[in-house]
UniProtKB/Swiss-Prot annotation:
Part of the 30S ribosomal subunit. Its main location: plastid. With S4 and S5 plays an important role in translational accuracy. Located at the interface of the 30S and 50S subunits. This is Small ribosomal subunit protein uS12c. The gene is rps12.
Amino acid sequence: MPTIQQLVRFERQTSEKKTKSPALKSCPQRRGVCTRVYTTTPKKPNSALRKVARVRLTSGFEVTAYIPGIGHNIQEHSVVLIRGGRVKDLPGCRYHVVRGSLDASGVKDRKQGRSKYGGKRPKGD
């Protein structure tokens, strides 16, 4: 434990928190242009073809972003909105594409959790 004199000479250092999504630069979302759209396989023990996009952001970063939902219309040169949020079984994928905004369309025929996928309200209700 430091003495009062030591505290006068050297103040306590506050530990700086490291952000989990540095490419957003403290913004809730960022716009970017897709440079490559492809599928990749998850870590063990999972097995799938996960849809991801390489996106060049307005902040200057180029990141890998996951495209959630069933089916998408994103292709190269599509302008998309990116939010934070990693995909646990895809190493290096720390961002999500926001469905239903800019060039990314919402998921069709989605009944539940529509707000997360930009789905339109069904006609029957």
